[in-house]
Amino acid sequence: MLAVLSPAKKLDETLHPSARLHTLPELLPHTQNLIEQLRGYDAAQLAHLMKLSPTLAELNVQRYQAFHFPFTPANAKAALFMFQGDTYVGLQAGSMDEQALLFAQQHLRILSGLYGVLRPLDLIQPYRLEMGTALVNGRGKDLYAYWGEHLVERLNAASESHGERTLINLASIEYFKGVKRAKLAGALITPIFKEVKGGEAKVIGLMAKRARGMMARYMINQRLESPEPLKTFNQGGYVYQPKLSTAEQWVFTRSAA
């Protein structure tokens, strides 16, 4: 069983040069091609392309100019610790021990507009490039065209050694759109997290993001190899609702605060 997450805009860029556990992104040559293209954009062009403020656009111009290879712990950081958004608040990677991190390395993947597919311990340098960006490139009109079948191929390769070839989709719609569903090996399950208030259940973006991280952590901590035990997930007060669920969409609800 394999789970996928989206990345985060908020980053912790503090480096740990002595970090022992690290790997390199598997699609790095494709990343290098994108970096070369993005280095040709000035702040105004980047602001227009990514809908960024002038300050953020300038920051990312500097980031792309500063990219340098090869990646080492002295100039890059493991993806699981670099990303700091709501999903990663729920994941709490900083409190995982080495065995948990090694399990995550085998059973968790992070989709990325710049890196394609990341393993948790893959070294990355800071960036901003969302999967939905309409970046015209040599392969098509956007990043979905650029990554093509690379994403699903890497996910299939990752799950090949697992006894249970089920993908748990904890990514956003924007990011998972890059995975060609028809070519995905095995079953697909997308957990849906809803808040119940006044008798009505709704998806609240912030809460759903954190819940996705909490479920990923639950899967890692429990060393889950098959999806059925995920129905016992109850972190944060969520409860699985079989009557609201389907084979491919598992609904979890909790009472809104």
From Swiss-Prot:
GO cellular component, one term: cytosol
Source organism superkingdom: Bacteria
Gene Ontology process terms (BP): response to hydroperoxide
UniProt cross-references to HAMAP family, sorted A to Z: UPF0246 (MF_00652)
Pfam families, per database record: H2O2_YaaD (PF03883)
Protein name per the record: UPF0246 protein Mmc1_3117
Species in which this protein is naturally found: Magnetococcus marinus (strain ATCC BAA-1437 / JCM 17883 / MC-1)
Family: Belongs to the UPF0246 family.
InterPro entries hit by this protein: YaaA (IPR005583)
